[in-house]
């Protein structure tokens, strides 16, 4: 297995990263242009979200050809140059494999529509009448999870958009096709893979109505998932690659199996439970303040259980589907800098592999779009109409989108203070964040030792410098309040203790360990330290502190 305990991954959403040809869309040459910046940041892998040919109904997660580059992003030669240039700087590329579904424009689906039974078996088609849907399962993007094709008198399953048809992994030919795609990219010099919603690919043989939910309990972590993953990794020859699975509505038990080295499935897992603590009754589109007690409990559960079972966590707050974490759990104004640093430190020093999403390292904020016309995300547009239909006012629906839309993370990267943030010379495909201001740019933070960007560089360097962060055991400390999370990492004689104040109030916490007198390794306030003789410590708003013997 690859050694990934001291590595850090940087996620790039190419469409919004850097536009070099003036069409308003980011491109592969834009990634090449910024490689020196990424090398200086200190990251090891660059995860690129899909750049494959796609009708872009779901921003590239509707793939029409897995072994080509969409001309919008550049050419295969550009990509090969990116692979070479990244490698020359000690960084590997991680590609995003969307294997639960293809675009309905993919040649396989087109052949299926034309009546080719071989290719109909590549997907999940069910015979039926237009007025009798196979099951009551719901799409992740709203509405039914089935689509009727009158010409075929069949329904096809699509857990996401109508243009994203689910693949039939029970068909060995499908699995062989997917292995071939991995081999193709492996031969191009790709060093790592991220598998999109991979725990949804194994569907039950008999599909039935779900009267208790939206159907997910029948297909999440499905009947043959572990068997199929082992086969995919083994036969594609990627056992020694860094691999990460995006796991939708999964459990710790399954993630231990997915990521324990002896299982030979994946290196690590993304789970999203900690990012649902502000979902009212588990509903993404129902807002409520974050439940900090729940957040703490989830971190403790996933860290401790994965450690016990030899599993490995992918540590993250942000990605192309999530709102900006500073807007969500931090503070956009008075404590912008402190809260961004605290949130970064909280996950970077845990047991697992940290992921940074573009712009997170400079504290980028949510989009805050004032009108529906500015949104582009298919999920957001669908749910805007669902919210209105369910009785919300236009103002309420927009407030919900402002907090939850995936477009929050997709606004153009803010390189400098120019009109379009140095992303492009022309109007970008998605409007700039309304929270765009000069201090939230790479240029403003690059040479400032107190900046959020400098703080991220320090965190990345610490993981490489101190084995206790990469390899140490984790345990959690009782702080006496749900607003402060504290944990300890230990490896032999090395130890660090991390304190994180999760909100904008001062909190006095229990702090009576022998480590109180240890040197402060990193903090987000100036010259603060604990009294070696005391038993409590009063934390400033969003304060972060690491003490240690390393």
Annotate each language-model stretch with its function.
Residues 2-183, 187, 200-253, 257-261, ...:
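Acidic/aromatic-lined carbohydrate-recognition and catalytic surfaces
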Residues 4-5, 227-229, 233-236, 249, ...:
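Loop/helix patches that line or flank the sugar-binding groove of alpha-linked glycan CAZymes
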Residues 46, 193-195:
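Hydrophobic residues within beta-strands of alpha/beta enzymes
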Residues 312-333:
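Active-site clefts of carbohydrate-active enzymes
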Residues 506-525:
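Beta-strand-rich binding/interaction modules
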Residues 531-550:
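C-terminal beta-strand-rich structural cap/linker in extracellular carbohydrate-active enzymes
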């Amino acid at each position: 297995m690859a050694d990934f305990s001291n590595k850090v991954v940087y996620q790039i959403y190419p469409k919004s990263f850097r536009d070099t040809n003036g069409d308003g869309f980011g491109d592969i040459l834009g990634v090449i242009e910024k490689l020196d910046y990424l090398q200086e940041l200190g990251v090891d892998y660059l995860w690129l979200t899909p750049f494959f040919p796609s009708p872009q109904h779901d921003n590239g997660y509707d793939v029409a050809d897995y072994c080509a580059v969409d001309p919008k992003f550049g050419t295969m030669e550009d990509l090969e140059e990116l692979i070479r240039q990244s490698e020359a700087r000690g960084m590997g590329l991680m590609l995003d494999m969307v294997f639960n579904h293809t675009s309905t424009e993919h040649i396989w689906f087109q052949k299926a529509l034309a009546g080719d039974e071989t290719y109909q078996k590549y997907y999940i088609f069910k015979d039926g009448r237009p007025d009798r849907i196979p099951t009551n399962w719901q799409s992740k993007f709203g509405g039914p999870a089935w689509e009727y094709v009158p010409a075929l008198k069949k329904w096809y399953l699509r857990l996401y958009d109508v243009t994203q048809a689910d693949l039939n992994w029970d068909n060995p030919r499908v699995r062989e096709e997917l292995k071939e795609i991995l081999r193709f990219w492996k031969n191009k010099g790709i060093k790592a893979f991220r598998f999109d919603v991979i725990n949804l690919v194994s569907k039950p043989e008999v599909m039935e109505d779900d009267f208790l939910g939206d159907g997910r309990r029948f297909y999440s972590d499905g009947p043959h998932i572990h068997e199929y993953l082992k086969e995919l990794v083994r036969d594609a020859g990627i056992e020694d690659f860094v691999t990460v699975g995006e796991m939708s509505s999964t459990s710790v038990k399954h993630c231990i199996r997915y990521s324990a080295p002896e299982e030979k499935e994946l290196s690590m897992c993304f789970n999203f439970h900690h990012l649902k603590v502000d979902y009212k009754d588990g509903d993404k589109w129902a807002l409520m303040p974050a439940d900090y007690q729940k957040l703490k409990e989830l971190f403790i559960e996933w860290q401790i259980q994965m450690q016990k079972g030899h599993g490995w966590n992918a540590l993250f707050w942000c990605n192309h589907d999530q709102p900006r974490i500073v807007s969500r759990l931090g503070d956009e104004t008075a404590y912008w800098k402190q809260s961004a640093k605290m949130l970064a430190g909280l996950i970077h020093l845990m047991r697992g592999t940290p992921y940074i999403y573009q712009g997170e390292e400079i504290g980028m904020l949510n989009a805050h779009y004032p009108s529906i016309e500015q949104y582009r995300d298919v999920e957001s547009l669908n749910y805007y109409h669902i919210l209105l239909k369910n009785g919300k006012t236009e103002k309420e629906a927009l407030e919900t989108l402002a907090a939850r839309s995936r477009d929050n993370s997709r606004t153009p990267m803010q390189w400098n203070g120019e009109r379009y943030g140095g992303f492009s010379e022309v109007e970008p495909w998605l409007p700039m964040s309304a929270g765009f201001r000069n201090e939230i740019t790479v240029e403003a933070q690059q040479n400032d030792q107190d900046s959020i960007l400098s703080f991220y560089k320090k965190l990345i360097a610490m993981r490489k410098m101190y084995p206790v962060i990469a390899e140490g055991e984790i345990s959690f400390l009782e702080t006496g309040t749900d607003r402060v999370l504290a944990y300890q990492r230990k490896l032999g004689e090395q130890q660090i203790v991390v304190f994180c104040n999760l909100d904008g109030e001062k909190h006095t916490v229990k702090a009576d360990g022998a480590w109180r007198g240890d040197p402060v390794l990193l903090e987000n306030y100036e010259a603060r330290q604990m009294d070696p003789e005391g038993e409590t410590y009063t934390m400033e708003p969003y304060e972060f502190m690491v003490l240690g013997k390393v």
